[in-house]
Amino acid sequence: MAKFVFITGGVVSSIGKGIVAASLGRLLKSRGYNVSILKLDPYLNVDPGTMSPFQHGEVFVTEDGAETDLDLGHYERFTDTAMSRLNSVTTGSIYQSVINKERRGDYNGGTVQVIPHITGEIRERIHRVASNSNADVVITEIGGTVGDIESLPFLEAIREFREDVGRNDLAYIHVTLLPFIGTSGELKTKPTQHSVKELRSIGIQPDVLICRSDRDISDDLKRKIGGFCGVPTRAVIPSLDADSIYAVPLILEQEGLCREVLDVLNLTDHDSDMAAWEQLVNKLRNPGPSVKIALVGKYVQLNDAYLSVVEALQHACIAQDASLDLHWVCAEQIEADGADTLLRGMDAVVVPGGFGNRGVDGKIAAIRCAREQRVPFLGLCLGMQTAVIEWARNQAGLTGATSAELDENTPHPVIHLLPEQQDVVDLGGTMRLGVYPCRIAPGTLAQRLYGDEVVYERHRHRYEFNNSYRNLFLESGYVVSGTSPDGRLVELIELKGHPFFTACQYHPEFLSRPGQPHPLFRGLIEAAQQRLPDSPAEALRQQGDIAIP
């Protein structure tokens, strides 16, 4: 039978509950426990698929095609365990399910209420993850902050959960902030006390407190916090600001988090194997020469909009002993100032996914610059589509070529709507989503990087390369290096005679891991290193990846 851990947050939002959940998952897995992690989000959207990246950040896509919160990316990267649509729950999806049941008559004419029906649905979702994942421990992160109206049904549900499984089979962790007041020179505990008081008023007594701080927390202060909050001093866990999120599991391990959680759950504290993770963090902290990577996007004002792309670049840099010098380049700014100006001195260019017209011309200009100046280039999803448009206009002689998404009346729709999308009306959850196979062409850059004939990648798109133009592209020098197994859909393209120019319709960033970077990203960083004096790139490639158990 599974054990359950619930993680709440107080004082401020964005306090790092997702990283705590992912880190605890890593620590439990290092002790031999199977782990699954789910996120309860208090917003009324059914999923984040139609939300603006400026409001929500990246949409992370699971293997089974769920559009989810970016925290699921952290869960997968830290635990190297695939999550599913069951691991992402929103208030909107809960209410949708309950209302559908009411319409079907499942409640036999009863009055449908927040308690017990909404809270019961939430509890059922948590139990479903446990039964489907065969996890020894299910970790649940509750989004939002204690005290928010939106979070109340979730907090009530996890309080009720205690009656479902018994007090010895679950643990409550509360993540809070200790602000430092410069004028008094003190860390203040009162916000934490009030946050725990609010949590206790709901009926939840935390077993462990994780205290975020930018400086050391004294033993006296830990005793004070524990005394006021009803938590043993040893269970007051400091979590100081770290230089990397990948250092957080090591910090929490040193502070005894996993030991305390296992004690509450009555589980054995097996020996931990974090040696490979320590090696990874050590490489991250002691990199080789830096590579300048330009990320050309539409949403660069919010870094979280491209979180998995940035992490994938970091993973590749760790493997290649490189320091990531990331330059955020606004695609619209390129339209104003020119690609040659804004991309001068870059060792590689990445154009990630996106939607809509805004910034597209800037992306096309960046791709042309990378192609003509032989700068390593990687395009992802819309990045591949804009690479196709750039080639069509500037090399294949197709004046006015573009995507049907951007201009329905274009004379040359080199990118067009997938046939199965023709009659789709709803926006949410209707794209080509999840894992699909891709057959790699022999003798290509892609084959060298992947080393496999068939690979499986995650998708999120409605538009695809228009096969009416495939022969023209092939004749003009384009290489189709990856297709669907039936050869119908173009999934991966590259250019001959260029140091590194490839683009894919899928999202490889979702499969990159700290100890196992995605081949396309590692290839990009290797190519970027080739532009450095005395490049060590090829020798480093032969070292292989860090095997994290």
UniProtKB/Swiss-Prot annotation:
Binding-site residues, CTP: 13, 148-150, 188-193, 224
Domain (Glutamine amidotransferase type-1): residue spans on this chain: 292-534
Binding site for ATP: 14-19, 71
Listed Gene3D superfamilies: 3.40.50.880, P-loop containing nucleotide triphosphate hydrolases
Protein origin, superkingdom: Bacteria
GO CC terms: cytosol
Keyword flag Transcription regulation: no
Annotated TM spans: none
Chain sites annotated for binding L-glutamine: 354, 382-385, 405, 462
Positions annotated to bind Mg(2+): 71, 141
EC identifiers of the protein: 6.3.4.2
Molecular function via GO: ATP binding; CTP synthase activity; glutaminase activity; identical protein binding; metal ion binding
Reaction(s) the record says it catalyses: UTP + L-glutamine + ATP + H2O = CTP + L-glutamate + ADP + phosphate + 2 H(+); L-glutamine + H2O = L-glutamate + NH4(+); UTP + NH4(+) + ATP = CTP + ADP + phosphate + 2 H(+)
Binding of UTP, residues: 13, 188-193, 224
Biological pathway: Pyrimidine metabolism; CTP biosynthesis via de novo pathway; CTP from UDP: step 2/2
Note: CTPSs have evolved a hybrid strategy for distinguishing between UTP and CTP. The overlapping regions of the product feedback inhibitory and substrate sites recognize a common feature in both compounds, the triphosphate moiety. To differentiate isosteric substrate and product pyrimidine rings, an additional pocket far from the expected kinase/ligase catalytic site, specifically recognizes the cytosine and ribose portions of the product inhibitor.
Function: Catalyzes the ATP-dependent amination of UTP to CTP with either L-glutamine or ammonia as the source of nitrogen. Regulates intracellular CTP levels through interactions with the four ribonucleotide triphosphates.
Family statement drawn from the similarity comment of this UniProt entry: Belongs to the CTP synthase family.
Protein name: CTP synthase
Protein species of origin: Synechococcus sp. (strain CC9605)
Source lineage: Bacteria, Bacillati, Cyanobacteriota, Cyanophyceae, Synechococcales
Gene behind the chain: pyrG
